[in-house]
Amino acid sequence: MRSPVSIGLLLLSGVSALACERAEVASGATVPAVSQAASDPVFDAQAAHELLRFVNQARAQAGQEALVLDETLSRAAEAHGREMLERGQLSHQFPGEPELFVRLGQRGTHFNRAGENVAFDYSVQHVHQALMASADHRKNLLDPSFNAVGIAVVWVRCQMYVVQDFAHQLPTYEAGQAEDLIAEKVATLRTQTRLPRLNRLKNPNLSGACSSGKAKPNRAALSSARYVLSYSNAEPQALPPIAGNVIGNGQMKDFSVGACYARTEKNPNGAYFVTMMFY
């Protein structure tokens, strides 16, 4: 299930090349003397790290945890920055380009929340100040739910396109690890309801089964269970509310669980598909 995507676009126009050069000299940053062809852009890693420093300073002042610069998110940001450079305009999604959740998921990162800032400006320091002065952009920069960011900066003459892709990244687990996390959650819920632990059964029809984005046991396996629960979530141990009813049922004695991880059209950011059987 996708969480809301937060996006923001910022265009600063009417800045002369001379003003741009003066601002960059004052901030100590380097501006390429010759613009790169749009088909072969050179991304400014130093400027990206400088932007990260400004972002994390602002987050520290706001009492928020620092963001980690993530390589997969940076690759996604660079790909979108290349699109903006080639088209000569700002956008969060061009015709034929996937939406943000898909773009980030295609790079292999696992997450459940995302946001994006894009801007066109003339210096690292100035673009950060402008983003912080805009409510929507500032919200992304200081969002406490984000823990990682990818940043791309590409110059065209003395001005730059900037992309900041934010995400709340989550750990990924092998099937067995995910199943163990779910089993631990079941044990915790049984303890909270003062019921004896359920005996966990190994079920080869469930373990690692993943078909079309669902953990699907065969019909024979299903017929032996008193209750079957299937769900999907970016975090396998985040059980749906209805799970509490069956786990808290004193008549249940045993259970088995199967989980698999997949990216689907509905879940481009990745999700665990889980089936639990109670006996």
Question: Where on the chain are the PLM-derived regions?
Answer:
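Functional surface patches built around histidine and acidic residues
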Residues: 20-279
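Bacterial N-terminal signal peptides
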Residues: 7-16
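Positively charged n-region of N-terminal signal peptides that target proteins for export
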Residues: 1-4
